[in-house]
């Protein structure tokens, strides 16, 4: 038996379409547990977010990196800041036409950039997240072996720090944000798709499936609100 859907493989969809915070973190915990408990074959994060708190983004990132089942990101327009960190943790990233990913500088509640010690930690966090996906080995027509990162950590760092230069892509004057086409070219997007169904059928090769969307309860929203760190001033 595959999942609780019988013959069709079960996949879960968890929406991240608001500011990353305690409520989003609770959604992710509950949705992930529900997916695993029902033997889901994978999770799709349906993302459209401009960022949020660093602590909750890091918690979601860690959950994804340690996930027992594949987690795929569908960037439905925006994965900015904390959203970029979460997307980079996923096994695969897919983007809608016109989508964007990046701009992960650490800022305070007013939007001002935090001191460099905070940026340094975020650079290391986003770099290690990209590195976690490993390297790919290819053999050229001339017989040479080429080894490269599946997701170049330098590109991830450039999303945080204006001083990072990525030859051929980014100079040292701005924080990096990638369009869907740029992300596809540079290894931060596996395909440009219009919807989740295209991911399932064309990218994952699953023509028939059951897609269960995690539906948070009023209690989930209440708990998330009560756990909201009102004094947590550091955002990403």
Describe the residue ranges of each PLM region.
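Core alpha-helical transmembrane segments of integral membrane proteins
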Residues: 226-236
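Soluble extramembrane regions of membrane proteins in the secretory/endomembrane system
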Residues: 1-226
